[in-house]
Amino acid sequence: MRLNTIKPGAGSKSAGKRVGRGIGSGLGKTCGRGHKGQKSRAGGFHKVGFEGGQMPLQRRLPKRGFVSLTRGRCAEVRLSELAQLPVEDVDLLVLKQAGVIAADALSAKVVLSGAISKKVVLRGIAATAGARAAIEAAGGSCGE
């Protein structure tokens, strides 16, 4: 096989509709658009959401909710995710670089989900009571 001999599979490609090529084609003269009217004209169609002058649905329904500019960006980290990290000292930057938490997270908290058997030292990261106990049982510490 060579790059210049590759072809699409049989029947996978269909030819485009050829319009305006005579009566016998079934798509001659008016090209399948019918006679007169807005939809037969070039560029003749309403914009998306237009309902003929009736108040459109997106304007009939009320606005709802808002985006809080002060929302807390605290990420949740599982014990099982901590166990997979290649380093022992864990801080916010390490978690971001490993892709465990989002890049815009301002803080993180470790929760008791999964198990951990290796020593981990948390720096500047909060932990729930259960997660703290599991980390300390594995020989690690939570220095906040």
Swiss-Prot record:
GO terms for cellular component: cytosolic large ribosomal subunit. Keywords: Ribonucleoprotein, Ribosomal protein, RNA-binding, rRNA-binding. Residues 1-51 are annotated as: Disordered. Pfam families: Ribosomal_L27A. Signal peptide: none annotated. GO terms for molecular function: rRNA binding; structural constituent of ribosome. SUPFAM superfamilies: Ribosomal proteins L15p and L18e (SSF52080). InterPro entries: Ribosomal_uL15, Ribosomal_uL15/eL18, Ribosomal_uL15/eL18_sf, Ribosomal_uL15_bac-type, Ribosomal_uL15_CS. Residues 21-31 have a biased composition (Gly residues). One of its GO terms (biological process) is translation. It comes from the Bacteria. Binds to the 23S rRNA. Belongs to the universal ribosomal protein uL15 family. Part of the 50S ribosomal subunit. HAMAP family: Ribosomal_uL15 (MF_01341). This is Large ribosomal subunit protein uL15. It comes from Azoarcus sp. (strain BH72).
